[in-house]
């Protein structure tokens, strides 16, 4: 039963309406937004990215792995006048899903961790997965950074003159990880870029985290 007072809005699809409201709310704020996706590693990469960005800017991020059309607007609603940046994780299992998410998010930078076999039953092949993941570029402005894993065979083939594509990796990439040393609970490595080296220690183990 409806309460006798208050406003109610009837919509055809509550999930689509929630995403549309989130997109409208996000459009009120002129802030940089990092959007990231990938077959695996999305949530860990989101956490690392938000820590780096958050070291300088007041940053909001996707909570847990709430990365679909219901969870994503909940993150967008966290933005307020003090927010300086956002890191948004995007998941999908069908074509068109990331397209709808970026329409609401309006990212200014995008990152793809890898192309594996997750949801291949819905997308037909790894090429289909690549196509679906690249929907993340639909919301990017021309010239925006597009950061890709150069060690992934599918992502390494991506070319698009509309964006500033940057590859990272251990074997291939403009940004490369070298001198990797795994310890009991940490991993040391060097990030090398155009002859410059930055030593990094992360509080976890595993080359996949590097």
Tell where the protein language model's regions lie, with residue ranges.
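Phosphate-binding loop of NTP-binding sites
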Residues: 16-145, 150, 154-163, 193-196
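Adenine nucleotide phosphate-binding catalytic loops in nucleotide-utilizing enzymes
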Residues: 126-127, 163-210
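N-terminal leader/targeting and accessory segments in enzymes
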Residues: 1-20, 24
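Active-site regions of enzymes building and remodeling cell-envelope glycoconjugates
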Residues: 5-12, 161-169
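Short beta->alpha connector loops at strand-helix junctions that form conserved
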Residues: 1, 11-13, 63, 169, ...
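Short, polar loop motifs at secondary-structure junctions
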Residues: 1-3, 150-154, 170
